[in-house]
Amino acid sequence: MIVRNLEEARQTDRLVTAENGNWDSTRLSLAEDGGNCSFHITRIFEGTETHIHYKHHFEAVYCIEGEGEVETLADGKIWPIKPGDIYILDQHDEHLLRASKTMHLACVFTPGLTGNEVHREDGSYAPADEADDQKPL
């Protein structure tokens, strides 16, 4: 069994911060822990907009705290996000995530992340079996 504490994990390399300062993510469970998914607590900071397009990963996102919206770029549809809401990127949806109040999100990825991924310029992460040599955001 593996037991981790969020605040303790934030003091380690499990805390990944976007180069542009829009978000940080504490990777509590990673691919190396076994299983086929990873689990993260991510903060999207107030007043930011982040372009995301997980071409190689399925993601489910549950809002714990804060407020914002997610916009799918294919159709321009906007969904408000508040505590208690979940959005599921079941079609690898390219989207914009905006926070009107800092959002605390519980995120599950499959396949699981290794922990060192950063968003590429196109908003994606590298496939699980590919080295990530593209420039990060």
Curated annotation (Swiss-Prot):
Reaction catalyzed: (2S)-4-acetamido-2-aminobutanoate = L-ectoine + H2O
GO BP: ectoine biosynthetic process
pH dependence text: Optimum pH is 8.5-9.0.
InterPro entries (UniProt xref): Ectoine_synth (IPR010462), RmlC-like_jellyroll (IPR014710), RmlC_Cupin_sf (IPR011051)
Protein origin, superkingdom: Bacteria
Thermal behavior of activity: Optimum temperature is 0-10 degrees Celsius in the presence of 0.05 M NaCl, 15 degrees Celsius in the presence of 0.77 M NaCl, and 30 degrees Celsius in the presence of 3.0 M NaCl.
Pathway where it operates: Amine and polyamine biosynthesis; ectoine biosynthesis; L-ectoine from L-aspartate 4-semialdehyde: step 3/3
Keyword Ion transport: no
Enzyme class of the recorded protein, top EC level: lyase
GO MF terms, alphabetically ordered: ectoine synthase activity
Protein keywords: Lyase
Pfam family, one: Ectoine_synth
EC number: 4.2.1.108
Stated regulation of activity: Seems to require potassium ions for its activity and stability. Slightly inhibited by N-ethylmaleimide.
Region (Disordered) residue spans: 118-137
Function of the molecule: Catalyzes the circularization of gamma-N-acetyl-alpha,gamma-diaminobutyric acid (ADABA) to ectoine (1,4,5,6-tetrahydro-2-methyl-4-pyrimidine carboxylic acid), which is an excellent osmoprotectant. Does not act on N-acetylated amino acids like N-alpha-acetyl-L-asparagine,N-alpha-acetyl-L-ornithine, N-alpha-acetyl-L-lysine and N-epsilon-acetyl-L-lysine.
Matching NCBIfam families: PRK13290.1 (NF009806)
Family the entry assigns: Belongs to the ectoine synthase family.
Name of protein: L-ectoine synthase
Organism phylogeny: Bacteria, Pseudomonadati, Pseudomonadota, Gammaproteobacteria, Oceanospirillales
